[in-house]
A protein has these predicted regions:
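Ferredoxin-type iron-sulfur electron-transfer modules and their immediate structural context
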Residues: 3-163, 170-379, 385-387
């Protein structure tokens, strides 16, 4: 009466009725006796992956995921005191948040890969399988012939537990080969996706990496992030990692991209499964990203230029092998081309390792910074808040 009397007696009486209705609606819930003595949870399954990553998952990520992060002792983070975290943790989350997920119809598909191209979370991916690889795949694996690669079978794999259900793949598909269906109906496709990710490597084809179709056969080194469903930002970032990911530095402004890209212990950036290398990512202060990115560029450029001078001294020595001299010449021919410099850099490092093993102290010193020898690219990621 005191609170609502000024609004009229009708309003007061409606509040009284609401209170009475609440009291009348109370009913007893009988708790099963078995709840007082529950069975112990089964032991967690062994996790596959790099030992240091698995340890991070068990010791840090899992307690946080079950809302138990406040109980973690400081010792849990000692290995991360400098801010470094293992890459690839997001692949272990398997959140299963989507109500509906894509179902791929192999008969209607033309293999354009546009669905994978627009996917914000890298949860729908194309693979090319040999006959033996297809025979070893789960029985429920769907495949089709591909005119551009007749020696392989084409598979579009979907991860139901990582998909966010945005439906962008359906929107972009030119032949309506994808439909959204209840997640439960696609549960058996998780094994197909996991098999392809773990066992199928990229095949050499005539499809260029700088095309929509060809680029999507490259492993995405940004996957299963915490961005919103259908986020275009992560679609762009994922594509960049498919083109430059093993040799890229990212200076990231504070904003959405630092939240989905750098949440402590749950990095969506990952490493190439063959080389073990992935993007180097760092988050600057909100307003300083341009300077931070420029600093990264100048720093790695200066280190590399000094290394090349030192390698030139070793290669120019009378004691240098003919193989080392030839490898250095090949390296110099491509030193400003990130993609073309890859193999020459590996060959040069191999020759430097031989020289170091033979007692060349200068080569041994150079190899301490060998990660800077190959040509890299430096990227600045930021949103409107930073840019303007």
């Amino acid at each position: 009466q005191k609170s609502y009397g000024k609004k009229g007696q009708d309003v007061v009486e409606m509040n009284w009725k609401a209170i009475d209705a609440g009291v009348d609606a109370i009913h007893k819930v009988d708790v099963p006796a078995s709840w007082s003595n529950p069975e112990a949870d089964p032991a967690p399954k062994a996790l596959a992956g790099r030992p240091e990553l698995v340890k991070q998952i068990r010791d840090v990520m899992e307690p946080i995921a079950r809302m138990d992060g406040d109980s973690l002792p400081v010792s849990s983070f000692v290995a991360n005191a400098n801010g470094e975290w293992e890459q690839g943790a997001s692949a272990y989350e398997k959140r299963g948040t989507a109500v509906n997920v894509p179902e791929w119809d192999a008969a209607k598909c033309v293999g354009c890969n546009q669905c994978a191209f627009v996917c914000s979370h890298a949860t729908i991916r194309p693979f090319l399988l040999t006959a033996d690889e297809l025979a070893a795949a789960p029985a429920q694996t769907k495949s089709r012939d591909n005119k551009l690669t007749p020696e392989y079978k084409f598979v579009m794999a979907v991860s139901p537990l990582d998909c966010m259900g945005c439906g962008e793949c359906v929107t972009v598909c030119p032949t309506k080969a994808i439909t959204m269906v209840p997640q439960d109906s696609q549960a058996d496709q998780q094994a197909v996706f996991d098999y392809c990710v773990a066992n199928i490597s990229k095949k050499a084809t005539k499809m260029a990496d700088d095309t929509v179709m060809g680029s999507q056969f490259n492993q995405p080194l940004l996957e299963f992030s915490g961005s919103c469903a259908g986020c275009a930002e992560t679609s762009y970032a994922r594509l960049i990692t498919q083109l430059f990911g093993e040799k890229m530095y990212i200076s990231n402004a504070t904003g959405c991209s630092s939240i989905w890209g750098g949440t402590a212990s749950i990095s969506p950036y990952t490493v190439n499964k063959d080389s073990g290398h992935g993007p180097a990512w760092c988050n600057s202060l909100f307003e300083d990203n341009a300077e931070h990115g420029l600093g990264l560029y100048i720093g790695q450029k200066t280190i590399r230029e000094n290394l090349i001078k030192e390698i030139a001294e070793v290669a120019g020595s009378d004691k240098a092998s003919a193989e080392l001299k030839a490898a250095f010449e090949k390296f110099l021919e491509t030193k400003n081309n990130t993609k073309a410099n890859d193999e020459p850099a590996k060959a040069l490092i191999a020759e430097l390792e031989k020289a170091a093993a033979a007692g060349c102290e200068k080569s041994a010193e150079i190899l301490k910074s060998k990660q800077f020898i190959a040509k890299k690219s430096v990227w600045i990621f930021g949103g409107d808040g930073w840019a303007y």
